[in-house]
A protein has these predicted regions:
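Amphipathic, Lys/Arg-enriched alpha-helical "gate/interface" segment within cytosolic domains
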Residues: 2-130
Length: 130
């Protein structure tokens, strides 16, 4: 299952992966949300928070995402998850092949706030009402 994280705002979108990720998650949630953000912003940044993640086959959905024309407007991806995901990212470089020009970084679960901060770094943030 994939859902959008409420802390998402502007050009920084977060998604929580929980359980099993399906190809329809790409088509009905991930891509439409990113395309909406791109309507208002030149580039977008993505946080992928992995929780209780049980299974995933990259398959057609992942391949379609890697070939998605809007991917050229993604400049940062933060992957937040357990130690197992850090190991996967180190041993499966092919997972992110096709992400040329995108800065992809791993953050442990206890550094979620740092991941959001890194994604928002350098962006103009409108002043908050007092």
């Amino acid at each position: 299952m994939l859902d959008r994280i409420k802390e998402s705002s502007g050009s920084v979108l977060g998604f929580r992966f929980d359980g099993k990720l399906s190809e329809s998650d790409y088509a009905t949630i991930l891509i439409p949300d990113l395309e909406r953000a791109m309507g208002d912003h030149q580039n977008v940044r993505i946080l992928l928070k992995i929780e209780s993640f049980r299974s995933w086959r990259p398959g057609e959905g992942w391949d379609a995402f890697k070939q998605w024309p809007g991917l050229e407007r993604v400049d940062r991806i933060a992957v937040v998850g357990g130690e197992r995901w850090r190991e996967w990212m180190n041993h499966l470089p092919g997972l992110f092949v096709g992400f040329a020009g995108i800065d992809v970084r791993y953050f442990p679960e206890n550094r979620l706030r740092d991941a959001w901060g890194w994604l928002r770094e350098g962006l103009l943030v409108p002043p908050q009402p007092a």
